[in-house]
């Protein structure tokens, strides 16, 4: 009657999969070609560069809007020359008004 000691209770932790260590595309199995073609999916975002790009893009859109607004105003104007030879801008008028 040999009494074997009771085996110690071992708590088994759930197995961690590799996909859960790195969430998103960084943990996904991809080819080298896919990583080379799409590096922005795997590189940590650079917030100062993103802020600079957002400000630059916003200024470009605002400038295009400004040019569009000034072009609309110039469309109704033409350069007139009076009898003394002075040039000035005059608004086009319709013959029907």
From Swiss-Prot:
Pfam family, one: DUF4500
Keywords assigned: Membrane, Transmembrane, Transmembrane helix
Major subcellular site: membrane
Biased composition (Basic and acidic residues): 9-20
Region of interest (Disordered), ranges: 1-26
Compartments, as annotated in UniProt: Membrane
InterPro entries linked: UPF0708
GO-annotated cellular components: membrane
Membrane topology: Single-pass membrane protein
Membrane-traversing stretches: 48-67
Organism superkingdom: Eukaryota
Similarity comment text for this entry: Belongs to the SMIM8 family.
PANTHER family (UniProt xref): SMALL INTEGRAL MEMBRANE PROTEIN 8
Name of the protein in its database record: Small integral membrane protein 8
């Amino acid at each position: 009657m040999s009494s074997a000691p009771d085996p110690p209770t071992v708590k088994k932790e759930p197995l961690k999969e590799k996909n859960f260590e790195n969430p998103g595309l960084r943990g996904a199995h991809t080819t080298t070609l896919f990583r080379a073609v799409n590096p922005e999916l795997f590189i940590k975002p650079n917030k100062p560069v993103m802020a600079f790009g957002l400000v630059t893009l916003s200024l470009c859109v605002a400038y295009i809007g400004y040019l569009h607004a000034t072009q609309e105003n110039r469309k109704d104007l033409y350069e007139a020359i009076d009898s003394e030879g002075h040039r000035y801008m005059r608004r086009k008028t319709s013959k029907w008004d």
